[in-house]
Swiss-Prot record:
<keyword id="KW-0694">RNA-binding</keyword>
<comment type="similarity">
    <text>Belongs to the bacterial ribosomal protein bS18 family.</text>
</comment>
<dbReference type="GO" id="GO:0022627">
    <property type="term" value="C:cytosolic small ribosomal subunit"/>
</dbReference>
<dbReference type="InterPro" id="IPR001648">
    <property type="entry name" value="Ribosomal_bS18"/>
</dbReference>
<comment type="subunit">
    <text>Part of the 30S ribosomal subunit. Forms a tight heterodimer with protein bS6.</text>
</comment>
<keyword id="KW-0699">rRNA-binding</keyword>
<dbReference type="GO" id="GO:0006412">
    <property type="term" value="P:translation"/>
</dbReference>
<dbReference type="GO" id="GO:0003735">
    <property type="term" value="F:structural constituent of ribosome"/>
</dbReference>
<dbReference type="Pfam" id="PF01084">
    <property type="entry name" value="Ribosomal_S18"/>
</dbReference>
<keyword id="KW-0687">Ribonucleoprotein</keyword>
<protein>
    <recommendedName>
        <fullName>Small ribosomal subunit protein bS18</fullName>
    </recommendedName>
</protein>
<comment type="function">
    <text>Binds as a heterodimer with protein bS6 to the central domain of the 16S rRNA, where it helps stabilize the platform of the 30S subunit.</text>
</comment>
<dbReference type="GO" id="GO:0070181">
    <property type="term" value="F:small ribosomal subunit rRNA binding"/>
</dbReference>
<dbReference type="InterPro" id="IPR036870">
    <property type="entry name" value="Ribosomal_bS18_sf"/>
</dbReference>
<keyword id="KW-0689">Ribosomal protein</keyword>
Length: 84
């Protein structure tokens, strides 16, 4: 009978441990605030997950909706190939 190989889990890396929006006292994230939205998108254009940024679930949902609206209105690019 063959031996079972134990796989090692990759350690999770958490960069921030606090929500930036809660600390700043922000109540809503607006799609027109392009600078804030661009800080939460990586270089390939993907939305950065909350486990990397430390954003709370409430603000992560608002952030995702705002980024999608801003993309639709062409305020921010969908991918890195669409430069302004």
């Amino acid at each position: 009978m063959a031996k079972q190989v134990k796989r090692k889990r990759r350690p999770q890396i958490k960069i921030n441990t606090f929500c930036r929006f809660t600390a700043a006292g922000i109540t809503r994230i607006d799609y027109k605030d392009v600078d804030t939205l661009l800080k939460n998108i990586n270089e390939s254009g993907k939305i950065t997950p909350s486990r990397m940024t430390g954003t709370s679930a409430k603000f992560q949902r608002q952030l995702t909706t705002a980024i999608k609206r801003a993309r639709f209105l062409a305020l921010i690019p969908y991918t890195d190939k669409h430069k302004k």
